[in-house]
A protein has these predicted regions:
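Beta-strand signatures of extracellular beta-sandwich domains
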Residues: 206-208, 257
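Mature catalytic domains of secreted/periplasmic carbohydrate-active enzymes
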Residues: 1-173, 177-201, 208, 218-232, ...
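Extracellular Ig-like/FN3 beta-sandwich strand-entry sites
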Residues: 237-239
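Edge beta-strands of jelly-roll/beta-sandwich modules across compartments, strongly enriched
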Residues: 248-259
Length: 259
């Protein structure tokens, strides 16, 4: 799935039933785990709040792969190889960077140790993760809307420090957060995290950068944030804009950072 909701139907693991009773919860249609959409408004339209649960996504993957495909077993076999650091990094961006927990299975040999190539691949993967977060870019944050204008917001600037105690609730009359850099430079990634104490709220948002000619360029039309969203930017810019298009009540952010 491209998007992972944490708020899903309780009925998703039950046997399917036809939706014939307006108020009969036992007749609510099952949403199978393999469905493309587990938690959008459309998917949950017939469910009440009592029919929902918090069920975070988990992505399990083995570092091993078979010679002819990328799938490997949970145990060590000599005829299998290890996935490379670039492959593991892409998986990380598409799992941990899209509101899922990334669980990497690393099987030892029959002697109970990790072979040399496994250790090498893990070190290379770890180095790539460190490089992602090793060069934070400072910014001054502004929030507002097209109607009311933009104003400097110290609370949003403070979100660059990733701390569970951080929180900024975007007011009902605001939908834009601008991150103004100290100077023009290349931004590789935008990292966003919601404060999940208040549940998962953001449903759609766009990311823009200001070009060197002063125009706004859309980088990506995104959907969910949740625990973490990593947006690839890869552009030189002086300003990054987050435009919240749709949310379930006011978004609560705990972390906003550029790298």
């Amino acid at each position: 799935r491209d998007e992972e909701w944490s708020v899903v139907s309780k009925n998703k693991d039950y046997n399917a039933g036809s939706q014939t009773g307006e108020n009969d919860k036992s007749n609510l249609a099952t949403i199978p785990d393999t469905a493309k959409d587990l938690g959008s408004r459309e998917a949950l339209a017939d469910y009440s709040a009592d029919d929902l649960i918090w069920y975070p996504a988990e992505a399990d993957i083995s570092i091993r792969r078979r010679a002819f495909n990328s799938y490997g077993g949970w145990f060590y076999h000599k005829n299998e190889m290890n996935k490379g650091a670039n492959k593991l990094f892409r998986v990380y961006l598409n799992t941990a960077g899209r509101n899922a927990s990334f669980l990497l299975n690393v099987p030892p040999t029959k002697d109970g140790v990790l072979d040399a190539d496994t250790v090498k691949k893990l070190k290379e993967f770890g180095d790539k993760l460190k490089s992602l977060y090793s060069n934070p870019i400072s910014f001054t944050a502004y929030s507002g809307s097209a109607e009311k204008g933009m104003a400097e917001n110290a609370a949003v600037t403070a979100l660059s420090m990733d701390s569970p105690s951080n929180d900024f609730m975007l007011p009902s009359d605001e939908d834009i957060i601008d991150l103004k850099l100290d100077k023009s430079q290349k931004v590789r990634y935008l990292v966003l995290r919601e404060n999940l104490t208040y549940s998962q709220r953001v449903e759609r948002f766009d990311v823009y950068v200001k070009t060197l000619t002063g125009r706004w360029k859309k980088i990506e039309a995104c959907k969910l944030i949740g625990n973490k969203r990593i947006v690839l930017i890869g552009e030189e810019t002086t300003e990054v804009r987050i435009f919240v298009r749709q949310s379930r009540s006011n978004p609560h952010f705990r972390h906003i950072a550029l790298y």
